[in-house]
């Protein structure tokens, strides 16, 4: 949604000094953040080490996983479809490793050279590469998701979304799409902790956790159809937001404002219109299409020898595909409320973000230009103020602005270096 400066490594849980050392590593630098005492904290050390070697670590691990799983697990030779099982967990883990490698490779070897070619300044290059990666990912998966949706029996049909429970088999494309989506959001939990902290860090982390739980449980509980619908609704919004940010970093402020307006419209329609319609269908359509009770996962028939209300278990039934493949699975009101609670939790987060978006929209209509309100301090490591960051971001390609900005930063860093040197000399004298 809203998103490592290749020069920025966040010091998790510690404050940073503006006079940090840097380590050259191929085409990019890794900054060694330190706390006020000048000592690198263990989380900071790990972040620096991981970022330096993330490509090698990811590719090495991925090769081992490829040797273990050369194809999607649980293929049925008779029907030509796939089912679920415990080996899917290893495939998901391999997906997390894969996205870690692809993210680093695309940012360093594709998007960073592209940013230089387009004249994006170094201070904005990290944000450009982050948003570029998100455009690539979300565009690919939104297109794939829409292809699956369009060619399904539930296209434009909410009744069809809930019918056929439990749908035990699925195509290879659907299974790969769903498991890789889960792997991506699990990887985003790691990414959000490696990026520089933003004002909505807690909301972002909560969003990634809820999304991952929803994807994992809907997959194991035979509800990939509704999951596909919701992913299609949210992914297109993420594409438009990241694309608008790219236009801003390229200095195309007017195009950025237009893209932002399109993004705002899509946000309102997809996330507060169609998304809530899917949630409402849990009350209106689900009880008739998918009545409470227990079902045979092979035939799909409702079993009369089990409780008519489906019992009161939640996790036991949700994880049935991994716990007892081929056995009966039950649906009850508690499971329905649990899924609805998670979906409503996401809606609350999206309403919080909507408030931030409307602030930006107000600026656009006032002629000030679109700027992410969450990022007013994201360049604070370079000493920029809110106004200075906005002006600089809108005029990234202006050489005069760049020279003035660099000169002012050099002056500040020289003064800080002198003050720190004086402070260290005083400490040495006190120690004697």
Swiss-Prot record:
It holds the Pfam family TRAM_LAG1_CLN8. Residues 123-366 form the TLC domain. It is found in: Membrane. The keyword Transmembrane helix applies. Keywords: Glycoprotein, Membrane, Transferase, Transmembrane, Transmembrane helix. Glycans are attached at residue 77. Its main location: membrane. Residues 370-395 are annotated as: Disordered. The chain crosses the membrane at residues 55-75, 91-111, 128-148, 172-192, 226-246, 250-270, 273-293, 338-358. GO terms for molecular function: sphingosine N-acyltransferase activity. One of its GO terms (biological process) is ceramide biosynthetic process. Pathway: Mycotoxin biosynthesis. Belongs to the sphingosine N-acyltransferase family. Gene clusters encoding host-selective toxins (HSTs) are localized on conditionally dispensable chromosomes (CDCs), also called supernumerary chromosomes, where they are present in multiple copies. The CDCs are not essential for saprophytic growth but controls host-selective pathogenicity. This is Sphingosine N-acyltransferase-like protein ALT7.
